[in-house]
């Protein structure tokens, strides 16, 4: 079974409270999501493999640690996932960026895939799938399906807010992946929104309704 972890760093929790507030402007929401994503990148990359390298400091030669060259990809689920890309890429600047397009049918709450564009060597990369909300889990499951179909093996899912129902569904569908979130909220309401949640992340990021 993959790992499930709530990232409870004080800075992450503080900033998450700011964007939950309905009075948070689009500009502020976008900036803070970016900041949280950078902090999350630090946490979710803790186990990246290291190797010994010989360097020369101004004083002399030394054996030190360096990331071993594991390739990374950041794959947002469109469109809300785009808000998390730049923040994660701040700490992982050599990451390739893929995209998976999904939209949710407001009647059935089921996701539909409409676009997939990934690095050609996705099977060799550690993949961070990003989406601010893990609600029903439908979009996350379909995104991981699409990645595995194209050869991805090392997959981690990163969200800002998750519902227990979504976590359970994703774990049951893909028990091998790790799931990280900044908050595990109470439940889904009858409209499929996370309670208390933060509203529609895509609309709040892009100023649409």
Curated annotation (Swiss-Prot):
Pathway: Pyrimidine metabolism; UMP biosynthesis via salvage pathway; UMP from uracil: step 1/1. It catalyses: UMP + diphosphate = 5-phospho-alpha-D-ribose 1-diphosphate + uracil. GO terms for molecular function: GTP binding; magnesium ion binding; uracil phosphoribosyltransferase activity. Uracil binds at residues 194, 199-201. Its EC number is 2.4.2.9. It holds the Pfam family UPRTase. 5-phospho-alpha-D-ribose 1-diphosphate binds at residues 79, 104, 131-139, 200. Its cofactor is Mg(2+). Binds 1 Mg(2+) ion per subunit. The magnesium is bound as Mg-PRPP. One of its GO terms (biological process) is uracil salvage. Coiled coil: none annotated. Allosterically activated by GTP. InterPro entries: PRibTrfase_dom, PRTase-like, Upp_B, UPRTase/APRTase, Ura_phspho_trans. Keywords: Allosteric enzyme, Glycosyltransferase, GTP-binding, Magnesium, Nucleotide-binding, Transferase. The keyword Nucleotide-binding applies. Catalyzes the conversion of uracil and 5-phospho-alpha-D-ribose 1-diphosphate (PRPP) to UMP and diphosphate. Belongs to the UPRTase family. This is Uracil phosphoribosyltransferase. It comes from Pediococcus pentosaceus (strain ATCC 25745 / CCUG 21536 / LMG 10740 / 183-1w). The gene is upp.
